Each structure stands twice: as C-alpha cells, then as structure tokens.
Amino acid sequence: MVMNVEIISKEIIKPSSPTPHHLRKFKLSFIDQIAPPFHFPIIWFYDSKKFVDVEPFERSRLLKESLAETLTHFFPLAGTPINEEFSINCNDKGVDYISSSSPMQVITSDTQSKWQ
C-alpha cells in the first residue's frame, strides 16, 4: 500500500532558553562510548477527530513550544557529537521538526483496539 504524505513544513526547533556555559560540554559515559550508534526515527500520529476544537496550525505551534521547553531540560539532545572527545557539544543547535498531512486513515477500527 502506498501512503501519500504531504510535507507542510520543515524546521529546526531550538531550546527555549540557552544552555548555561558550564554545561556546554557533556561527557559521554563509558557505556555510551562503547555502544554502537543507533537512531530512533519517531513518528507520532494524531487522530484529527479528537482535536476538532484546535486548528492544525495551533496544534503544531503547541507541539513546537513544548519541544523547545523540553530541550531546555534535556540539552544534550539539541547538541552535536564531538567524536574524538567522546562528548556532546551542547550548542543548542536544535532538532528537526517536520509537519505533514495525509488523507489516509492510519489506524482503522480493526487495528485500533490493538493499540489501546
């Protein structure tokens, strides 16, 4: 099955407040240093019928605002790796935020009970 998805916007979300200077370099633990690299692509799906009273633009704005505030507390996630030093430069570079839309229903009534 082919899924048609329209990308509405792509942007970088940065922490809502800058990382303090004394926390700019985050040293990785020994376990983090020996673990193989991996990536968790995350896609969140929302049933638009549950958000009838909230416009899509407003919903996206709230998600971006929440993400920016979260990155303030989890500042290494918004940084870049320094491979030769086994650390993260907590430079507030930010994370990717992609907003998209699809006319397809992702979870049908048959599969919905499995996800609840």
Language model segments and positions:
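Non-catalytic N-terminal regions of enzymes
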Residues: M1-Q116
